[in-house]
Curated annotation (Swiss-Prot):
Lineage, opening ranks: Bacteria, Pseudomonadati, Pseudomonadota, Gammaproteobacteria, Lysobacterales
Keyword Amino-acid biosynthesis annotated: yes
Amino acids binding substrate: 75, 81, 88, 102-103, 112
Protein name: 3-dehydroquinate dehydratase
UniProt similarity note: Belongs to the type-II 3-dehydroquinase family.
Catalyses which reaction(s): 3-dehydroquinate = 3-dehydroshikimate + H2O
Organism from which the protein derives: Xanthomonas campestris pv. campestris (strain B100)
């Protein structure tokens, strides 16, 4: 059994109502509940945290090094394009992570095309709406099974 951590960046608390044509109609609570259920069905635990504050996400990443977290799933949202501190935190704890995006940032505004995390991620899944999270979790579960 592995302990997994799912982090959501800024404005994802507005899922379901914020630009549903871009981000879909699923709420964050619905996404989290489905993922927790899937992780449990595979014999793992999944903790979820959303924050609009970068330092809260950084501190949670730091804590992951000590709490037995095996893998981090992260949708950094707008911090994707701006946060050296998230990058440094993820590299500092040395845990594998998957970068997740509901939309495909490469089909959007040019400022969204650069990620400070992608080159260090175990994988990047984007463009599939709420299914991006499910696909990321399935990839992590498969990796854990392969490596065990």
């Amino acid at each position: 059994m592995a302990h997994l951590l799912l982090l959501h960046g800024p404005n994802l608390n507005l899922l379901g109502t914020r630009e549903p044509e871009v981000y879909g109609r699923n709420t964050l609570a619905q996404i989290d509940a489905a993922l927790v259920d899937r992780a449990q069905a595979a014999g793992h635990t999944l903790d979820c945290l959303q924050s609009n504050a970068e330092h809260v996400l950084v501190e949670r990443i730091h804590a992951a090094r000590e709490d037995g977290t095996a893998f981090i799933l992260i949708n950094p949202a707008a911090f994707t394009h701006t946060s050296v501190s998230l990058r440094d935190a993820l590299l500092g704890v040395g845990l594998p992570f998957v970068e997740i995006h509901l939309s495909n940032p490469h089909t959007r505004e040019p400022f969204r095309h650069h990620s400070y995390l992608s080159d260090k991620a175990a994988g990047v899944i984007c463009g599939f709406g709420a299914d991006s999270y499910r696909l990321a979790l399935e990839a992590v579960i498969a990796r854990l099974e392969r490596d065990s």
